Amino acid sequence: MIYDFAVGQTNPETFPAEALKRAALRAIDLEGAAMNRYPGGKGHLALRELMAQRESERAGVSVNPANLVLMNGSMQAVTLVGQALMSAPGDLVITETYTYSGTIAAYKGIGLKLVGILVDAGGMRMDLLEARLKMLPVKPKFIYTLTSYQNPTGTTMSRQRRIELIDLAAQFDLPIVEDNCYGDVHFEGEKQPSLYAIKPDPRHLYIGSLSKIFAPGVRLGYLLAESPYFQQIVSR
């Protein structure tokens, strides 16, 4: 048997199909009228409120559903963020040296150039990130990082590294795009907090997804952001 470690594919047999069917029928009874209307640019309000509640409980900080927009999976969020934050083809974005192939394709497809930073067991190396930021001739548009269960290395960024990343991004006035699409693939030990939960900053953008725990074919993702980035993304 051959496993493709580049793809975050959950075993389809592990999803409770019958329970999901019953839940879907209940949802239609409860939200059927709303489902027959267009929900606006941010997505269905009740679902946005539920995702905001989910993140509030996970992160331990209050998440405002007004700052949350539903996405067609996390990859739509990844792409829209890139389009919203870039100014022109050739703009730079910082990523881990090895990152998700879909993100590489999406960013190269819209003309971004990726600058890779090596990772070790604790995630992206902050000493190398700082050195690269000081050396680059032009300022990158943002830092993109898979903080937990990074694809393809599987590393999880330590809390100390997360704090250092936040401080470095603030020092160089850079937005951070935290893609936490693998955050639910967690089985033991303490979960690391999201960046926005450690030190809230309007330059932090957060991408979440249910695709690893809830019917990947539904393509349910979401983005948390504040002004002015939120408006830039929603208007795409």
Q: Predicted segment positions?
A:
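N-terminal "arm"/small-domain region of PLP-dependent enzymes with the aminotransferase-like
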Residues: 1-41, 46, 53
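Short aromatic-enriched loop/helix-cap "lid" or pocket-rim segments at secondary-structure transitions
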Residues: 15-19, 155, 188-190, 217-219
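Conserved core of the PLP fold type I
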Residues: 34-172, 183-202
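A short glycine-threonine-serine/GTX helix/turn-capping micro-motif
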Residues: 234-236
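Active-site PLP attachment segment
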Residues: 184, 191, 196-232
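Short, solvent-exposed loop/turn segments at secondary-structure junctions
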Residues: 8-12, 75, 99-100, 148-150, ...
